[in-house]
């Protein structure tokens, strides 16, 4: 997200702040209190101020995955926006971690295509910087 390799990004139902899952995640069994530096280091939220490309966040309003409650995307949205970044948050009603309703799937595809059309396909070209190679 804070690289020149991308023009825009899309993140769906993510875990952006690991301090919100204080009793472990994936293969990490230590708690937040046992490994606070790790929890902060692996949390994309802590790098929100570095996100310099447009970011689309999509999340199911009823996500009951303990690592990816909707508050994860809401907080990431506010962190990027609060730091001056371009960000959009789409919350899908009645959807959990995986989106199953036809309307939600179609809406997700619409949002993703519109995002890339706006920020990638129709984006003005970047200035080239000579690298001296």
Which role fits each region the language model picked out?
Residues 1-133:
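Active-site-proximal cap/loop segments of hydrolase catalytic domains
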């Amino acid at each position: 997200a804070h690289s020149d390799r991308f023009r825009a990004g899309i993140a769906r139902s993510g875990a952006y702040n690991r301090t919100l899952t204080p009793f472990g995640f994936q293969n990490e069994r230590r708690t937040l209190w046992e490994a606070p530096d790790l929890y902060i280091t692996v949390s994309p939220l802590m790098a929100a101020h570095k996100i310099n490309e447009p970011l689309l966040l999509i999340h199911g309003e009823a996500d009951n995955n303990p690592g990816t409650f909707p508050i994860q995307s809401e907080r990431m949205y506010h962190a990027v926006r609060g730091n001056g970044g371009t960000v959009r948050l789409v919350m899908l009603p009645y959807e959990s971690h995986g989106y199953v309703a036809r309307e939600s799937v179609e809406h997700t595809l619409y949002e993703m295509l519109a995002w890339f059309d706006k920020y990638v396909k129709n984006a003005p070209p970047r200035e080239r910087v000579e690298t001296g190679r």
